[in-house]
Amino acid sequence: MTRIAKERGTDNVLADLGLPDAEELTAKAILAKKINDIIESRGLTQSAAAKRLKIPQPKVSAIRTYKLTGISLERLMQALTALGQHVEIIVRPCDRNTPARINVAA
């Protein structure tokens, strides 16, 4: 029987794929997911969401389909506040044995 070597990944599949901006992409996807959940729960059309978020409808479409190139983390956070969400950023020292990272919880 042949043994197959397994390589342990991280908790970020985008980093495991070697993407240089994996943490930012993951953060954007998490924020977009929260925005999409709110849009769906409120039954908003893309047009209605665009008015509420004060962004063009094509940007809402991009968020809805997770095509987040050209949409900043700041813009996503502003969208969440426009939807009545509190966005909090906490900076704290990391443990000695753990590399520093960006983490988003939504």
What are these regions (language model features)?
Residues 57, 68, 97-98:
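Short secondary-structure boundary/hinge segments and terminal tails
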Residues 64:
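DNA major-groove recognition helix of helix-turn-helix
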Residues 73-90:
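DNA major-groove recognition helix of helix-turn-helix/homeodomain DNA-binding modules
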